Amino acid sequence: MNTVKSLQEINIAFINDKSPIIDLISNDLLNFGIDILFRSENTKDGLSQLSALKELPKVCIIDLDFYDKNVLAQLQELRTQYPTIKLIAHSDIDAEKAVKPLLEISFDGCLLIGSDADDFRKAIETVINGGRLF
């Protein structure tokens, strides 16, 4: 298995998340050497930004909005179009009913709201190196 030896080798994208908390976490991740290719406000915009890239991110961190009835269909579309991207959910819900659909879509991990930049860094390293985090 090829493991990532340096965080400078990692590029990510944030989808469906433009919060001030993610602003702070993004700055910390940049300080860790992780390159953030883009941040989008919703999944549709994220799909559009992904299609414009020459090099895809290794990881997409997606804030889950379960109030959007189309969220699971949009996530399935994302997985289908970009099967090589590692997907990490960012959610305030850790109930089985929320996590089970993510497993069915083949998400690689889940971080709860309140996770700090170090938690994000560890999750990114885990999924890049073939692990899963739930």
State where each predicted segment sits.
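C-terminal output helix
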Residues: S115-I124, I128
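Conserved phosphoryl-transfer motifs of two-component systems
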Residues: D108-L111, T126, G131
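Conserved phosphotransfer microenvironments
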Residues: I22, T43-G46, K58-L78, A95
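As written
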Residues: L102-D108
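Conserved acidic segment of CheY-like receiver
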Residues: Q8-P20, I25-L29, C60
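Two-component signal transduction core modules
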Residues: C60, L87, C110-L111
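Short hydrophobic/Thr-rich beta-strand motif most characteristic of the beta2 strand and flanking loop
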Residues: I34-K44, Q49
